[in-house]
Amino acid sequence: MESETVLYSADFCCDDPFLRRGEIFSDITFYPYPGGLFTYIEKYCKIKKDFNCIYNYVYTCLQYRGDYMSELLRVENLHVAVGGKTLLHGINLTVNTGEVHVIMGVNGAGKSTLLHAIMGNPAYEITEGHVYFEGEDITELSTDKRARLGIFLSFQNPVSIAGITTENFIRTAKTTISGKQQRLFPFKRLLKSRMEGLAMDPSCGDRYLNDGFSGGERKKSEILQMRILEPKLAMLDETDSGLDVDAVRIVSRNISEFHNENNSLLLITHLNQI
């Protein structure tokens, strides 16, 4: 195994011509997290509060693949509107296989908008630009087709779905995405193992999806889906928000266990610890 290599970069989207890449780098210190999969950002760069900026911090662990990385996601000149109002102006982003990207910024900067646009949420209209996944233009693809390609979005506020249990929901999704029928008992064993790893109450699997779940249980349910579905690109929208210290530790560990040289993460968070 090769020695760990850390690469980092920062990009942003804002209308302030005086903010430059060098200014961003000058105020950030990167440290490899124990285990080699995450970056601790010592402090944020100092910016004018009257500008809404999106910051993209990328950490890459190359200990498995040397210096070779394949492009997984590419966003080109993306403009996104919601309700006729343009929220994103000319976003460019490239995520290679094996990378972890952390998006930070003030509330209302458009962080969640970017993830929903990548996922193909019809409420977020792409008025200009393109989204490519594994070299294929997916700008016009529906959300379910993007999911089948291996794109996963964990919601900031997960919704409940009455009428379908958590187990059946994840099993059906796994079957649809993989194209292989999930045998009942092996799947139950996998579900039990993943739930134990998240310190989830075993009854959650038999309950309707997120119905009556606490805020922490809903966030863990999203990570449970990610662990079992094993997407190529996992986008997590403030999965750590509203969690207590122990839950943040558990979720962080599961994210670390999920990530490897064959998948990528795009995270929105306000916590350095995640």
Regions found by a protein language model. Name each.
Residues 73-75, 88:
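Conserved structural motif at the start of ABC-family nucleotide-binding domains
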Residues 104-106:
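The feature captures the beta-strand-to-loop junction immediately N-terminal to the Walker
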Residues 130-146, 210:
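ABC ATPase NBD Q-loop/coupling interface
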Residues 157, 163-177, 190:
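Q-loop/switch helix immediately C-terminal to the Walker
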Residues 226-227:
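ABC ATPase C-loop
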Residues 238-239:
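Walker B catalytic motif
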Residues 248-261:
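Helical segment within the ABC ATPase nucleotide-binding domain
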Residues 268-270:
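H-loop/switch region of ABC-family ATPase nucleotide-binding domains
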